[in-house]
């Protein structure tokens, strides 16, 4: 038997190293198992044929040549098929082949030419084949938003959102993705209807999946009656529609959020103002109550003083009346006179301008 100069199984191993970066694939693994079993069957069959050749050589030399020619042609075909199968096998079959090659080449010495040739061929094949790069996955561009928005400036009374959507879809304007209706705020001056709990909406927005559908809907239904069943609730109401060019649902939600935040801010300011006014009012009420209590106490004090003064005057008048009643007839007042005694003044307290008596003057004239 001639030794092989090129090891085909090692070449397949290098190809497997190139494809090892692709990861695990369950389908490829199942196919490789089937190919491995098929190849093992072909190996055993080739071995049996080689044994038959040796038996024929011993028995009959003439028949050996003919049988060898036939067997060689068959073996060439089988080896060609076998080589094609080897080129398509995966990593699991190649590892087994490498083990078999090592067993077959073990008889060859390291210094033999067959060994050196096989070694050089394997090194050249492993270094010559470049690695295949994976194609990059194509990034799909984001889908454009092709929706259209229609604005309804007025709506029929008590019309609900799902009823509006069904009315538009029955007329062929679909698909409708979103509907938003603004609830009507009742005026403070108007009468309050407590019995009717149905909601009314002031205006609304409808988003269609296609701009074309939105434009056709606005152009077709604008300034036309709602129609439908003749005795229906909304038969005679008129559509008021307008297609908003370049307007998206995100803009509407942003506007709604901004209006809601502004409304909440105004409500907070009004609440704080009302609380301050209530606080001032309560303080004024408390202060007024205190002043009323003080005034009430002062009035009671004045009233008590006036009553005491009146009682005293009445008592004085009563005593005077009783005293006057016993003195004169019929209560006539009598005038009484009292004699006053002259006050005696001492000698040392005589004034200088007082006149002296005649006796005293005579005595004094004699002395002085």
Swiss-Prot record:
SUPFAM superfamilies: RNA-binding domain, RBD
Chain residue ranges for the region called Disordered: 1-144
Keyword Nucleus belongs to the record: yes
Subcellular location, principal: nucleus
Locations listed in the record: Nucleus, Nucleolus
Bias type Basic residues, positions: 70-80, 130-144
MF terms in GO: RNA binding
Comp. bias (Basic and acidic residues): 20-34
Start-end of Acidic residues biased regions: 49-64, 86-103
InterPro entries linked: ABT1/Esf2, ABT1/ESF2_RRM, Nucleotide-bd_a/b_plait_sf, RBD_domain_sf
Chain ranges of the RRM domain: 148-238
GO cellular component term, pick one: nucleolus
Ranges of biased composition (kind: Low complexity): 120-129
Record flagged with keyword RNA-binding: yes
GO process annotations (BP): endonucleolytic cleavage in 5'-ETS of tricistronic rRNA transcript (SSU-rRNA, 5.8S rRNA, LSU-rRNA); endonucleolytic cleavage in ITS1 to separate SSU-rRNA from 5.8S rRNA and LSU-rRNA from tricistronic rRNA transcript (SSU-rRNA, 5.8S rRNA, LSU-rRNA); endonucleolytic cleavage to generate mature 5'-end of SSU-rRNA from (SSU-rRNA, 5.8S rRNA, LSU-rRNA); small-subunit processome assembly
Record key words, sorted: Nucleus, Ribosome biogenesis, RNA-binding, rRNA processing
Xref: PANTHER family: ACTIVATOR OF BASAL TRANSCRIPTION 1 (PTHR12311:SF7)
Family: Belongs to the ESF2/ABP1 family.
Functional note: Involved in the small subunit (SSU) processome assembly and function, and in the 18S rRNA synthesis. Required for the early cleavages at sites A0, A1 and A2.
Protein name from the UniProt record: Pre-rRNA-processing protein esf2
Natural source organism: Aspergillus clavatus (strain ATCC 1007 / CBS 513.65 / DSM 816 / NCTC 3887 / NRRL 1 / QM 1276 / 107)
